[in-house]
Amino acid sequence: MADIELRFHHDMLTLSAPISYVLEKQGVDVAEDLEFVNLLEPDTVRDALKMQLTAGAQCLVANTEGICASRLAHKRMEDRQAEIAQAAVKVARECSPQHLICEIGPTGLPLDPSSKASVKQSVGQYAAAARALGDEGVDAFLLNGMDGVCDMRCAIEGVRSVSARPIFASFDVDGQGMVEGHGIMLADAISQLRDGADVYGFTTSADPVSAADTSRAAAQA
């Protein structure tokens, strides 16, 4: 059992925010270089992450959202996936957080739930991403912003196939509590996934009252 699991249902854990805004303010082209800055400017990434710890985050989320090979392929860097992943983990670990979480974002590939080949490809992408990040010093994986329930299921299956670390699964939802672009309530999405992930969450731009309603409904799923 990872140490972070001992805190589930006992402590309120705060995850660090994405550092893309800070890096952009410092002149980094986050649309093109967000993953590569781990290799090129580790000190810049380290300083941005340390700011999150100073703000009180117990869980530091590594700068690895775009680590899937299909995403790196757009920049012709898929063959450096492991190098980029390990650089990001190293920089985050050097900040000495209470807990280190590695984020994996969507593959960006088309996914046909009715096609075994399509599903297998997606699962393989997520498995390779988790394998590149490794388990050493990593307390959990954050699967963030996947494109609907099927994509999230593929991500969970892929990570589970190579790691026993806890999984945090987070959806993007609208003001009505629906998974963006998929016409399904967050609570229903979680119910479909059942016990696939250890922790479920969501990102929303909704007002606090609506967000609280979504949270309560999801907690009952």
Task: Describe these PLM feature segments.
Residues 1-221:
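Domain-level signal for soluble alpha/beta catalytic cores
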